Amino acid sequence: MFAQPYDHSFNDLFNQYVNMETSAVDGKDSALSDFDQLFPLDSLSSDCGDLPPTVSTPKRHQSPQPWSNEWSLQDDGAAADHFAFHDTVHPSAISDVNLNNFEVPSRPTASHGLSTSPSTPPATPRRKPTQSALITPKSIRHRSPNERRSHLRKQSFSPSLMRSSNLSKARMAYPEAWAQRLQNFSLHGSEDRLPLSPPPSDVLIQHENMPTEQIMNQHGDSAERPSQYDARLYQQSPSVSMPSPSIAMSARQQQHYIAQPSSSSLTNSSPSSADDIFSSSHSSDPHSLSSWQSDPLHASSLSFTPDLQGQDSQWWSPMPSRVAQQQAAYLTSPTPVRTMQSVGSQNDMMQGGLMIQFNPSYDMSADHSFSSSNMLPATPQKFDTSFNTSQVHNVSRSPSLSPKAGTSPRDTRNGSISKPTHRRTHSRKLSGQSMNAPKPAKASGSSSRGSNKSVSVSFVNFTAHDSKKILTGVAPSGSSKTKARREQEARDRRRKLSEAALRAVRSAGGDVEALEAVLC
């Protein structure tokens, strides 16, 4: 049962809706025409009253408006047998199919369960008394669009904005139900008056209360319908003149849903929970009406504007987790992959689709924030230049880890190059000690003046510590005689150099004793 505050608020909103419909003589209110083609006013008006809905049939023909004639069923038997809309979507055909195929025990249950709202406004068209006595879920289904419309007008949104978010909610809620019922919409000649994005709750609740044999009968033509439905249902009709936020959001939703294949959009991967709309939604029993009437519709239909914003936040909320999962892969990926993808991923993030190119741009700006509006183009340019230069200098190495590590790519590049530099200089020192051995002999000469003469002692290796000791094992020849002779020659040369240095110091008037103390 519905709660009393919900009934009163809905009665006011419903009266507002009825007054708007009767005041528009042409019947083509742009904000309401797409609702009216999928939601019949006959089942709505007969189900939303506080009194039991016992309304006579001729009221259906009293209103001279053209929309009532447009809604009238062309051929009840044909529509009930084939379940195909003719030129426009006739909601009375849908209700007639439900009327002919409903089982009898579902009628008193639903009629007693929904007879608590205030009195019915008199200006809406009516169906037969059997149709009036029958309570389909369309009354409940029509309450949510009315609530949506009023709340969205208060919040300056448009109805198609709300319906498109509800479409994204409930489209993936029932994969089997949505697949089977979506295939039964043969919308062949209806581009002129087709709504932008019909609420899928019309399909879902009907399928919930359809008998299984009719579902199995309609399951035959399931091959050619969904692509046609996706291609044509979301085209903007020329007769619907929507306000600009509605057009923008519907275009965005159109790109979003056409980009998704029907198979992937029918999976259970919807970020919105189906329990916001239907709490016990997984049975096709008509008696399950009483279990989801009371609270979930009250919760979901009275808070539509926060529900829309929550829907958007839920839709984008898995993105940081996906970025966190794929960020490690991108941190260790080769350089050209990251740079090219970061340049290519600067597209508009609200394009929707399958979100193929989101993660590289998220990875580039993940150090700053995960918000989708922080796509700074300077960040990938900085990374491009640094990574390219590092690849020129150091081709065999993969790029540095990430800017998150605290060091820029140039720092890590210099560090990686400096390590081979140290190795090269060390090896040069080692080879210099073996190949360029005579060079230290200059510094270890007898004096600074005599060091230019010490080049002749090229076969002796002097170190920094044994300047007074001649090394014996360095001679290239292996003979002991040659070794002893060269050592003797070295001693003689050193003695001669020392004497020459002493003579030079004496001739210059220097301190000979100090020099002898150093040399000897």
UniProtKB/Swiss-Prot annotation:
The keyword NAD does not apply. Residues 63-72, 104-114, 155-165, 252-261, 367-401 have a biased composition (Polar residues). Residues 237-251, 262-295, 436-453 have a biased composition (Low complexity). The keyword rRNA-binding does not apply. InterPro entries: WetA. Induction: Expression is regulated by the heterotrimeric G protein pga1. Residues 420-429 have a biased composition (Basic residues). Keywords: Activator, Conidiation, Sporulation, Transcription, Transcription regulation. GO terms for biological process: conidium formation; sporulation resulting in formation of a cellular spore. Residues 49-72, 104-165, 236-295, 367-453, 471-496 are annotated as: Disordered. BrlA, abaA and wetA are pivotal regulators of conidiophore development and conidium maturation. They act individually and together to regulate their own expression and that of numerous other sporulation-specific genes. Responsible for activating a set of genes whose products make up the final two conidial wall layers or direct their assembly and though this activity is responsible for acquisition of spore dormancy. Belongs to the wetA family. This is Developmental regulatory protein wetA. It comes from Penicillium rubens (strain ATCC 28089 / DSM 1075 / NRRL 1951 / Wisconsin 54-1255). The lineage of its organism: Eukaryota, Fungi, Dikarya, Ascomycota, Pezizomycotina. The gene is wetA.
